[in-house]
Curated annotation (Swiss-Prot):
Function: Part of the Sec protein translocase complex. Interacts with the SecYEG preprotein conducting channel. SecDF uses the proton motive force (PMF) to complete protein translocation after the ATP-dependent function of SecA.
Membrane topology according to the record: Multi-pass membrane protein
Pfam families listed in its UniProt record: Sec_GG, SecD_SecF_C
Protein name as annotated: Protein translocase subunit SecF
UniProt keyword Nucleotide-binding present: no
Subunit comment: Forms a complex with SecD. Part of the essential Sec protein translocation apparatus which comprises SecA, SecYEG and auxiliary proteins SecDF. Other proteins may also be involved.
Species classification: Bacteria, Bacillati, Cyanobacteriota, Cyanophyceae, Acaryochloridales
Record has Transport as a keyword: yes
Keywords recorded for this protein, A-Z: Cell inner membrane, Cell membrane, Membrane, Protein transport, Translocation, Transmembrane, Transmembrane helix, Transport
InterPro entries for the chain: SecD/SecF_arch_bac, SecD/SecF_bac, SecD/SecF_CS, SecD_SecF_C, SecD_SecF_C_bact, SecF_bac
Length: 319
């Protein structure tokens, strides 16, 4: 299979633009509803999280699955109608509730009401956690700072190893990956109530590392072909470089994606959204490395050549 990327680069850019536009629209709607581009989880907003499971060792305690409507009725009675509710556990015998910050008396009152409605709860398997709003803001600030630092470090690294225009388009590709992933989860937040937490920031940082590595491999091949290859146009050189590294890109994406799909299908509730973040981000990263970063570089070098600028790579061969 041979790709002629630059002949159809307008198509690749249009696909990316459409995905990003859909995500931006969703984030705007999310901001109107949640005052945030994505639906924030407990880690960022602060509040109380209750993860409760029935005690199935008691006779007839687990005959029927827990119904969300039953839980919501209790929450309404406790004036906690805005809470997020999710049925969890084997055979739907558990429930996860995220709500506003509750004091000890309010927690006790809620768990007693749930016990009366749902049956005896397993104390050992049940958990109640509280995250203060100050800690939530600190987590968000730290996550954003980590993203900014990572982008800055990547610009420096790629500029030193290659040239600044390589670094510029590598960053454009990374922004593409982050925006596509954020847009996807913004849509999930609006349609399915999916929240993002501190693991989402970790996922974005992991996606950035994966994507820039893929881009650097392609850029390295482009540079080598420019130095030692026959006289070709920059578009031909980039197409050849992408095709030379295509097998490696596909294999890397498959070997990282398949385990993540397994985690998403068979993993626990906590890991599912994290695995989905990486699946979406790695797919976007593989796409941007092949179809965005490389074609943007070719387009820019063509413009430079028409303007009479020197586009020869003078960066060090190895670092």
């Amino acid at each position: 299979m041979k790709l002629n990327l630059n002949q159809q680069r307008g198509l690749w850019w249009t696909i990316s633009a459409a995905l990003i536009l859909a995500g931006v629209i969703s984030m705007a709607l999310s901001w109107n509803q949640y005052q945030a581009p994505l639906k924030p989880g407990l880690d960022f907003t602060g509040g109380t999280r209750l993860q409760l499971e029935r005690d199935c060792s008691k006779p007839d305690n687990c005959k029927t699955p827990i119904q969300i409507a039953e839980v919501r009725q209790i929450l309404d009675e406790q004036k906690l109608a805005e809470s997020n509710v999710q049925v969890i556990g084997q055979n739907a015998q558990g429930v996860a509730i995220r709500t506003k910050d509750l004091n000890q008396e309010e927690r006790t009152k809620l768990t007693e009401a749930l016990t009366a409605k749902l049956g005896q709860l397993d104390v050992e398997k049940s958990q109640i956690d509280t995250v203060g709003p100050t800690l939530g803001k600190q987590l968000l600030a730290s996550g954003l700072l980590a993203l900014i630092v990572s982008f800055a470090a990547i610009i420096v690294y790629v500029s030193v190893r290659f040239q600044f225009d390589y670094a510029l388009f590598a960053i454009v590709a990374l922004f593409h990956d982050v925006l596509v992933t954020m847009g996807f989860f913004s849509i999930l937040g609006l349609t399915r109530g999916v929240e993002v937490n501190s693991l989402f920031i970790v996922g974005l940082l992991t996606i950035i590392g994966f994507s820039v590595n893929d881009t650097v491999v392609i850029y390295d091949r482009v540079r080598e072909n420019l130095k030692y290859g026959a006289k070709r146009s920059i578009s031909e050189t980039v197409d050849i470089a992408v095709n030379q590294t295509l097998g490696r890109s596909i294999n890397t994406s498959l070997t990282t994606g398949l385990p993540l799909i397994g985690i998403y299908i068979f993993g626990g509730e906590t890991l599912k959204d994290f695995a989905l973040t990486l699946i979406v981000g790695f797919a976007a990263g593989a796409y941007s490395s092949i179809f965005i970063a490389s074609t943007l570089l070719a387009w820019w070098r063509q413009r430079q050549e028409r303007g009479g600028y020197n586009t020869m790579d003078s960066s060090p061969e190895e670092i």
